[in-house]
Amino acid sequence: MSSHAGHGHHEAPAPATPVHAHAHAHTHGPGGDPATDIDWDVLGPLLEQEAELNAAQYEEAARWIAALPTAPKVRRVLDVGSGPGVVSCLLAEVFPEAEVVAVDATPALLERAKNRARRLGVIDRFGTLEAELPEDFGRLGEADLIWAGNSLHHLGDQRAALAGFAGLLRPGGTVALVEGGLPTRRLPRDIGIGQPGLEARMGAAAATRFEHMRSELPGAKRETEDWSALFAAVGLVPQGTRSFLLDLPAPLSGPARDHVVASITREREVLGDLLTAEDSAVLDRLLDPEDREGLHHRPDVHLLAARTVHLGRRDTA
């Protein structure tokens, strides 16, 4: 299991975002995939930028958890699949008495997480753990809150992984799964070049790639993605589901536009042959900084997405 900062980034269970595209390829991609050789000095800032754009959603979700009448005092938090630690540090702010541990399989991202915690003044309650799940479940330690942001679906047996999380919870503790939601949209349906519906077709290609990734995971098992039922199956009490909206209308700020350009650049690379020649040509135009119809200049570029958080609680008895 690798990192997911936010992601970003669903036509199917997986959104077409750089976070997913990179993590899927890095951890599970076949040889020769252009995304398997990752420069974390390039990807790390992109992951941070994406998570920062979504920070308001994540903070709202964390405060929802903190305000639940059944919530125990949170003393230890595990952010599983933390990436560069944007959400980990946010959780440290929302739960000011808790130790927060960022868990990820990539040392370069954990170093970014640690540096971020230092900059934000939460390093005294912040730790990192390099771990690969499910092999390293026994190293995680117990927790009052386990945050799994778009990371569970990188484990072949999701039910067994949920049972593993349940076994780490202290009485009254909560698992927060960020899974599902709605696909990210950045362009109108008809952009005036190529066939209308470009992003929908990119989402379909991402869904195909996602299914291929899932099928190649060790111990992969198909599960109906009824998260409340899966919580109940592993002995947790479902505590509700909420979706949180990111809505940045046009015209975008410079940083948000830069992120859209960077994310679509990586999607163009990662989806590769799953796209038609016509759609690939349209993407080349969109990514050309000199093209007046491109992402660098279009007045209609926006950023709209919804992330869904599912909660399961361990009984206090």
Name every feature range the model reports, one short phrase each.
Residues D37-E59:
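Class I SAM-dependent methyltransferase Rossmann-like catalytic core
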Residues A176-L252:
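Conserved catalytic/acceptor-binding region of the Class I
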Residues A160-P171:
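A short glycine-rich, Lys/Arg-flanked "PGG" loop and its adjoining helix->strand segment in the class I
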Residues A55-K73:
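Conserved alpha-helix/loop element of class I SAM-dependent methyltransferases that forms part
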